[in-house]
Each structure stands twice: as structure tokens, then as C-alpha cells.
Amino acid sequence: MTVATPNLTTVPVPPSDSRERVKQFMQTLQDEICAGLEALDGGGQFREDSWERPEGGGGRSRVIREGNVFEQGGVNFSEVWGEKLPPSILAQYPEAAGHGYFATGTSMVLHPRNPYIPTVHLNYRYFEAGPVWWFGGGADLTPYYPFAEDAKHFHSSFKAACDRHYPQFYDVFKLWCDEYFFLKHRGETRGIGGIFFDYQDGRGDLYNKGPAPSGPAGQKAAEVGIVSDLNWEKLFAFAQDCGRTFLPAYSPIVERRKDTPWGDRERQFQLYRRGRYVEFNLVYDRGTIFGLQTNGRTESILMSLPPLVRWEYMYQPEAGSREQELYDVFLKPQDWVNWPTA
């Protein structure tokens, strides 16, 4: 099924105060998440570095290290603007050429010390350039040891957020997340996914400008068809709801796992699997690529990387082990919302 994209003249116009409103929300989201994580950790506190970008803009980078729960994590807010659009944007939106741009967002990655607590990532962003604007973002979970109830809770939380705004959001954005967080050179997903969306501007279908229209996410979006009743306000409300879904989606998982005993075997496997996180972020991640292309703050861009990591040549998990279960079940796309749990 081929879905025609409406003419550019049909793009809904954002409000005149769009940039300020989104910026304020992204800052508030950073504040709320940091406060919630400090309470969850019970010991660690975030250190803040404010920075300015010579070409225009700046941000606040907050890092927590050596806490009771979090070995290292970062929550970053940024807003940047400029006249020269990066190649990654022009490739998608040639009509933005000749216009200045504005981008703002909040991103987060947490690397817990206990291998039974999953790593988690979040990012919500907004972009404007002349007649072009869009929202993007999502959240995904990367466990080291498999717990179906954790995967089900995380996915169910974000499905509920999606369903509050548009009933087909989760169906498309879950598949898009599975597609995006996939390491092609390894043939495996980065974790159990979550939701991911990009280029949402109220026109076209929900997989607007996605790279694989014939894949599962593109096909599901084609089944849904063009969504004609989404505008700037509705998409902004959706992004806000998703941002505030993170803490109730993740905190119960941490509470369940933080006191689970672990030893050197679990630690070594955690460090090995963290290598996949490094590989993805340096090879595939759009946010990393965009930040480096726009002369962003390198320390903030690379704050997603874990403090310790290791690689092992030709590693194979032991047959019948929980590590093997991770590979067999949890590093492949699954219907986690409907997964049976005890």
C-alpha cells in the first residue's frame, strides 16, 4: 500500500511561541527526572554543567556517578540554533535549505551498577527550520538479565501513554523502536525496545520519512493511513505525556531489582553487553551524529557511554543459562504488552 504525502502547504503552522514553550517543557522534564532519580538512588546527586555553543545556544548537562544504584548516568537539556543546516537534516527536508534552524530536547541514559537492573534511555526533541518542524523521541530498555514482567511493565506504561492520544501510536512506534535500536552488524536488538518516533509534523502517515517503508513499522503505518487530525498542539501534548511516563515506567523495575545479589559472573556479562551500547551509539545513533555534525558539546553528546565496558572475542553464552535466554528471547522483537507472566 502506498500512502501519498500531502503537499507542503498543508503543514500545520506551529504557534508563535512554540520554541519557548517546548524549551520550557524540556527543562522542566530534566528537573523532574533528576529529582525522581536522586530519590530512587537514595545517595547519588547530579552534578550540573551549564554550557554555551559559540554558534548559538547551549544547555545543561547533569551527571550522576557512583551512587547507590546508578554507577553513572546523565540527563542533558540542550537548545541550539544556527544558519547552516546539518547534512542529515537537508537529506530529509531539502525544503528547509536557506532557513535558520532551532532544535531543543532532553536526553537521558542511566547505567546502573547492579546487573539485574536494566540500562535505560530516553530522548525527546523538537526541530524547526522555516516551514519545517517536527517532534521526535522515545524511550527504550536494555536489560542484562531477562525478566518478562519488567519488559511487560515498561511497554504497558508507554502503550497507555500512547493510547491517551491516538490509538495507533503504540502499534507503529513500538515497531519503529524495534527497527531503530537494531545492531545490523550483530543481528540483534539493543534491548527490549519501547517506543520511538521521528519527523512527526501532522502530515503523512505515522512512519513519516522512516527509512524502511516496506518494514513492519512502515507497513503498519500504511495500514493506519494518513493521520489528518494531528497538529502541533496534539503532538506537543503527546511528547509531554511520554516524557512524564518515564519515571513510573522505570522506577518500579529498579525497586524490584536493586537488592538482588550479584557476583563477578553477572558483572562480567553486564560489561560485555555494555559494549553493544557503545557500538550502537557510535555507529547508528542519530542524536550522536546530529550533535557531532552541528558542533555540539562533545562531553554532553558522549555522556551516554558507560563508565566501564569490555569486549570478548567470539563470546558464546552457556547453553541453558539466563545469559542464553537473553539472546534467545530478549534480543528479538516480542509482543511484550501481551506477554504472559506468572
Swiss-Prot record:
<feature type="binding site">
    <location>
        <position position="111"/>
    </location>
    <ligand>
        <name>a divalent metal cation</name>
    </ligand>
</feature>
<comment type="subunit">
    <text>Homodimer.</text>
</comment>
<dbReference type="GO" id="GO:0004109">
    <property type="term" value="F:coproporphyrinogen oxidase activity"/>
</dbReference>
<dbReference type="GO" id="GO:0005737">
    <property type="term" value="C:cytoplasm"/>
</dbReference>
<comment type="similarity">
    <text>Belongs to the aerobic coproporphyrinogen-III oxidase family.</text>
</comment>
<comment type="pathway">
    <text>Porphyrin-containing compound metabolism; protoporphyrin-IX biosynthesis; protoporphyrinogen-IX from coproporphyrinogen-III (O2 route): step 1/1.</text>
</comment>
<feature type="binding site">
    <location>
        <position position="185"/>
    </location>
    <ligand>
        <name>a divalent metal cation</name>
    </ligand>
</feature>
<keyword id="KW-0560">Oxidoreductase</keyword>
<keyword id="KW-0963">Cytoplasm</keyword>
<feature type="binding site">
    <location>
        <begin position="123"/>
        <end position="125"/>
    </location>
    <ligand>
        <name>substrate</name>
    </ligand>
</feature>
<protein>
    <recommendedName>
        <fullName>Oxygen-dependent coproporphyrinogen-III oxidase</fullName>
        <ecNumber>1.3.3.3</ecNumber>
    </recommendedName>
</protein>
<keyword id="KW-0149">Chlorophyll biosynthesis</keyword>
<feature type="binding site">
    <location>
        <position position="155"/>
    </location>
    <ligand>
        <name>a divalent metal cation</name>
    </ligand>
</feature>
<comment type="function">
    <text>Involved in the heme and chlorophyll biosynthesis. Catalyzes the aerobic oxidative decarboxylation of propionate groups of rings A and B of coproporphyrinogen-III to yield the vinyl groups in protoporphyrinogen-IX.</text>
</comment>
<feature type="active site" description="Proton donor">
    <location>
        <position position="121"/>
    </location>
</feature>
<dbReference type="Pfam" id="PF01218">
    <property type="entry name" value="Coprogen_oxidas"/>
</dbReference>
<dbReference type="InterPro" id="IPR018375">
    <property type="entry name" value="Coprogen_oxidase_CS"/>
</dbReference>
<feature type="binding site">
    <location>
        <position position="107"/>
    </location>
    <ligand>
        <name>substrate</name>
    </ligand>
</feature>
<dbReference type="InterPro" id="IPR036406">
    <property type="entry name" value="Coprogen_oxidase_aer_sf"/>
</dbReference>
<keyword id="KW-0479">Metal-binding</keyword>
<keyword id="KW-0627">Porphyrin biosynthesis</keyword>
<feature type="site" description="Important for dimerization">
    <location>
        <position position="185"/>
    </location>
</feature>
<dbReference type="GO" id="GO:0042803">
    <property type="term" value="F:protein homodimerization activity"/>
</dbReference>
<feature type="region of interest" description="Important for dimerization">
    <location>
        <begin position="277"/>
        <end position="312"/>
    </location>
</feature>
<dbReference type="GO" id="GO:0015995">
    <property type="term" value="P:chlorophyll biosynthetic process"/>
</dbReference>
<dbReference type="GO" id="GO:0046872">
    <property type="term" value="F:metal ion binding"/>
</dbReference>
<keyword id="KW-0350">Heme biosynthesis</keyword>
<dbReference type="GO" id="GO:0006782">
    <property type="term" value="P:protoporphyrinogen IX biosynthetic process"/>
</dbReference>
<feature type="binding site">
    <location>
        <position position="121"/>
    </location>
    <ligand>
        <name>a divalent metal cation</name>
    </ligand>
</feature>
<dbReference type="InterPro" id="IPR001260">
    <property type="entry name" value="Coprogen_oxidase_aer"/>
</dbReference>
